[in-house]
Amino acid sequence: MYIALKYKESNIVEYVLYMWHIEELIRSFNFEINEVRENVISKFNLNSEAETEMVRWYKGLIDKMTEEGIRDAGHLTELAEVMTEIQYLHHSLMTVYQEKSYQDIVAKAMPSIDALKSKSDGRQRIDIEVAMNGLFGVLLLKLKKRQVTEETQEAVKTISVMMATLAKHYNSMKQGTLSFPKVMEN
């Protein structure tokens, strides 16, 4: 809960990845709050007030996931909305703002994103969704202590740089400080 709040304020990409992980964690404990309390919350060594607050937070997520029908798969509506904002910002930086440095970073990441697209389930996916799914997949592999190939690690580096840059622009957008570059390319 505290980590989620910190990420939400400082790095929206890390926030989404963290919350996707929390969703998977809740699923792995079959939506049982007592299992979450015993296996997750108890590891934080919190005072009783903070523990109660964290239990309430997890219980709220369990209830939302159930209400939204995403017990087996999918993401919370709030996270889907954030993903839409991130995708919209990405598109704006590429076409409206024509942010040259961002365009260069995206160009370096595109071969990795295209490679991930070719390995996906055949559904048409937007670049940001593919990038986030790739980062999340590597995160899960690392959490499960599975080996991540050097090739995958290199691919993820370029995607990580792109998404970190996008997260910085997102913060600027939310703070109202994102502005058009002085020279537009169109």
Predicted regions and their residues:
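Residue-level recognition of alpha-helical structural elements
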Residues: 8-11, 50, 54, 75, ...
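Charged, amphipathic alpha-helical oligomerization/scaffolding segments
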Residues: 21, 28, 53-56, 60, ...
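A charged, amphipathic interaction segment
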Residues: 76-136
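Glycine-rich, aromatic-bearing surface loops/beta-hairpins
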Residues: 114-186
